[in-house]
A protein has these predicted regions:
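N-terminal polybasic/positive-inside topogenic patches
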Residues: 7-20
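Trp/Phe/Arg-rich N-terminal binding region typifying the photolyase-homology
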Residues: 20-186, 191
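Short, intrinsically disordered, charge-balanced linker/junction segments flanking boundaries
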Residues: 190-199
Length: 199
């Protein structure tokens, strides 16, 4: 009798839950462009395609003359701005836009994340030690998940047949160990992107 009552309560519960539509939480992503200013072969941008909305951001470094960092030279600055304009036009053709801001990531990005109620930050990881430390510092300042994916590399670190401790000292031994490895296939530019979030 107890088993029958239990089965009836389970049937009633399953009949009740079949009328409930699961609630899906909207995900707002922020893609922070750094050095990879293209839509094609961009794994970090491709990882945002499932988001409900996407905010694309680029941060211009702020000149710091007091520590002898005066910013970019005139030619490099012009090249960067032309590249950003081209990226913006490509994004606009997909219903997106590029927000270009100035300042350090650990100060600017948390404010942007709060203003637009971002749920997830995506950016590229770079192999430099200082760059890795800067990403770790930024991650410690955020209250949301941050994903940093490798971009514009011929190989992924997991493909190498040696550890960092066994890294070849010169190029020829390195070349012999990696020349048989498959190069990571390129990714096409997305046909569509999630829309920007409402301000």
């Amino acid at each position: 009798m107890a088993v029958l009552r239990h089965r009836q309560s389970v049937d009633a519960a399953s009949a009740y839950t079949s009328y409930i539509t699961p609630v899906r939480v909207a995900m707002r992503y922020l893609h922070w462009f750094q050095t990879d200013l293209r839509l094609d072969d961009n794994p970090t941008l491709s990882s945002t395609l499932s988001a409900d909305s996407l905010l694309c951001v680029y941060l211009l470094p702020k000149p710091r003359p007091w520590c002898n960092l005066v910013g970019l030279g005139a030619q490099r600055d012009r090249f960067l701005r032309e590249s950003l304009q081209e990226l913006r036009e490509q994004l606009q053709s997909l219903g997106q836009d590029l927000m270009v801001l100035e300042g350090s990531p650990e100060l600017v990005l948390p404010a942007v994340i709060e203003r637009f109620e971002i749920d997830h930050l995506v950016t590229e990881s770079t192999p430099g030690w200082h760059e890795s430390q800067a990403l770790n510092h930024l991650r410690s300042k955020l209250e949301i998940p941050m994903t940093a994916l490798p971009g514009n590399h011929l190989f992924q670190a997991a493909q190498f047949p040696f550890s960092l401790d066994e890294y070849p000292d010169t190029f020829s031994p390195f070349r012999r160990k990696v020349e048989a490895l498959a190069i990571t296939p390129t990714l096409p530019a997305p046909d569509a992107l999630p829309p920007p979030p409402a301000a």
